[in-house]
Design a protein with these regions (language model features):
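Positively charged, low-complexity terminal tracts
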Residues: 1-76
Length: 76
């Protein structure tokens, strides 16, 4: 298994189903997540035409663990 991620600018995101938190409300001011193979793409709903950021599932798991533990509460 390779630790190298593909260049997001060279990936096809056209078939990705994007999801956002139900807590984000009805506006377009959201972070959206989409699964693409073994990776998770992240984009800004206000700018869906921009290239998303791409993370491994392990990276997303570490982020979510930090969020759940309150590591980023000072940012809100």
């Amino acid at each position: 298994m390779s630790n190298t991620k593909p260049d997001p600018a060279e990936m096809d995101f056209s078939r990705v189903t994007w999801e956002k938190s139900p807590f984000s409300g009805g506006n377009d001011n959201c972070v959206e997540f989409g699964v693409i193979g073994d990776l998770v793409a992240v984009r800004d709903s206000k700018r869906p035409e921009q290239t998303p950021l791409v993370y491994t599932r392990g990276e997303i798991a570490a982020l979510l663990a930090g969020v759940k533990a309150g590591a980023f509460d000072h940012l809100a």
